[in-house]
Amino acid sequence: MKKVLFLLACIVLLVSCQKLDHNGDLGGYWKMLQLEEFERDTVIDTRQDDRFWAIQLDLMQLTGGESIGKGRFQHVGDSLYVQMIYVPVDYRYYGLYNPKDDRFEVIHLDRKKMILKSKYVKLDFRKF
């Protein structure tokens, strides 16, 4: 009986220590396919580049450019708010124009595709 109780206690402790990803379709590793800049009226095909947004829990990481960016985000309704803690040198390479407080409208989000739009850019991603 003591062994069973000890085993149950261990299982409960192990299960309670895990954090569950509450991001739904947003969580994961996203490869940027296209960056459309409204200011310059240009569309940049980024499929050959390695521009990635990694999203997990409330953290995000930007990789593929000259430097790595790390920050936090909030997904509220149809908006994604990004606050970078470690701002990459080439932050516009990732579609950020105000890396300390950027807001994106979530145009489309499912398990395979994400489209974000700010007042400066529109970003197309596919899940990697």
Segments the model singles out, each with a brief description of its role:
Residues M1-V4:
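Positively charged n-region of N-terminal signal peptides that target proteins for export
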Residues R51-W53, K70-Q74, D102-H108, L123-F125:
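Hydrophobic/aromatic beta-strand elements that line small-molecule binding cavities or substrate pockets
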Residues F6-L8:
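Sec-dependent N-terminal signal peptides
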Residues V43-Y81, I85-V89:
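N-terminal glycine/threonine-rich, aromatic-flanked beta-hairpin/loop signature
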Residues R72-S79, K113-F128:
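Edge beta-strand at a domain terminus
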Residues G24-R40:
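Tryptophan-anchored aromatic micro-motifs
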Residues L13-S16:
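C-terminal motif of bacterial Sec signal peptides marking the signal peptidase cleavage site
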Residues T46, V82-I107:
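An anionic, turn-rich surface loop/hairpin at beta-sheet edges
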